[in-house]
A protein has these predicted regions:
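Charged catalytic cores and adjacent phosphate/nucleic-acid-binding surfaces used
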Residues: 1-25, 40, 59-202
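Noncatalytic, typically N-terminal accessory segments of nucleic acid-processing enzymes
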Residues: 28-31
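Active-site-adjacent beta->alpha loops and helix N-cap segments on the catalytic face
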Residues: 35
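Active-site acidic/histidine clusters and adjacent loop/turn architecture
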Residues: 39-46
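Short, structured loop/turn "capping" segments at alpha-beta junctions
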Residues: 49-50
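Short, well-ordered beta-to-alpha junction loops that form the rim of enzyme active sites
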Residues: 53-57
């Protein structure tokens, strides 16, 4: 998720990214770009911009996905890791599940619906109280990441509104084409190979 404070910043960032990839493909940009480099471009284009890695557990391309190549946020964002203070959990997990992983303790956890799935818009959301503003919202998330008292802030982060994680596509392992659904321990016992067709599972 990329946030910039003004429309002018958004236009500047869009122009820069259009030189790198396709911004019009099916509602989601296709960029041949590492996440760290996208963060650097965003920071250069817009003062006050914020990046929140989204759907962090999705297997294929997400920050902590099994196929991403990263085990830690620092492996992905390198020298710019300090600019990441929040993570979006995705539909297949919720903040309570993520809080079981101590390395995520220093991050605010947010939940969002997919903007490219209009029928499901709003099934997950972030709850704020107080006077909404761009700066206020991110100040509240930064305070939440540091476990600081938010009572003096104009805008406070209260938490998230969650759908049922077990309804998420990636809550359990499996192979959709073969209608196979397994607990992770059972997938590991099978070497993450579908027992029906012999192909890798997600």
């Amino acid at each position: 998720l990329v946030f910039v404070p003004t429309l002018e910043d958004a236009e500047r960032l869009s122009r820069r990214l259009a030189q790198i990839g396709n911004l019009n493909a099916d509602g989601r940009p296709i960029l041949g770009l590492d996440s760290r480099d996208l963060l650097e471009i965003m920071l250069e284009c817009a003062h006050g911009s914020v990046m929140i890695p989204a759907h962090v557990w999705t297997p294929w391309f997400a920050l902590f996905g099994s196929k991403s190549g990263f085990d830690r946020l620092e492996d992905c964002y390198g020298d710019l890791s300090e600019h990441i203070f929040a993570l979006e959990t995705g539909l297949s997990s919720d903040p309570a599940m993520n809080r079981l992983i101590s390395r995520l303790d220093g991050y605010a956890l947010v939940s969002n619906s997919d903007a490219h799935s209009g029928a499901n818009l709003g099934r997950e959301a972030n709850l704020f109280a107080g006077r909404p503003s761009y700066a206020g919202m991110f100040a509240a998330l930064r305070a939440s990441a540091k476990r600081q008292d938010q009572s003096a802030l104009d805008c406070r982060f209260l938490g998230t509104m969650e759908f049922y994680p077990d309804e998420g596509k990636y809550h359990l392992d499996g192979h959709r084409a073969c209608n196979v659904v397994l607990e992770p321990k059972d997938s590991l016992a099978l070497g993450n190979i579908c027992s029906v067709c012999g192909k890798p599972m997600t």
